[in-house]
Amino acid sequence: MANSKQAKKRIIQAERNRQHNVARRSMMRTFLKKTAYAIEKGDVEAAKENFAKVVPILDKYASKGLIHKNKAARHKSRLSAKIKALATAA
């Protein structure tokens, strides 16, 4: 357990930041799931709309260190490829 005033403050800050990050990560995953669901249903317009919303979120969280930049790039690349394949098939 923390003994100094500074250590106690850091524990409080760490918990606050953890809760903030959990909420942001959850929001990001929700947007990714919405996009994946639209692709699965075959709805090109909804997929493109959701993809346009999720890309800036991924970029923002990658720049802030919430997720790794390669993870953001991987998600964007895979979703983009699936949407492109869906659009050409339709």
UniProtKB/Swiss-Prot annotation:
GO BP terms, alphabetized: translation
Pfam families in UniProt: Ribosomal_S20p (PF01649)
MF-aspect GO terms: small ribosomal subunit rRNA binding; structural constituent of ribosome
Superkingdom: Bacteria
Disulfide bonds: none
Protein keywords: Ribonucleoprotein, Ribosomal protein, RNA-binding, rRNA-binding
Cellular component GO terms held in the UniProt record: cytosol; small ribosomal subunit
Similarity annotation: Belongs to the bacterial ribosomal protein bS20 family.
NCBIfam families: S20 (TIGR00029)
Functional description taken from the UniProt entry: Binds directly to 16S ribosomal RNA.
Protein name, per record: Small ribosomal subunit protein bS20
Gene it is expressed from: rpsT
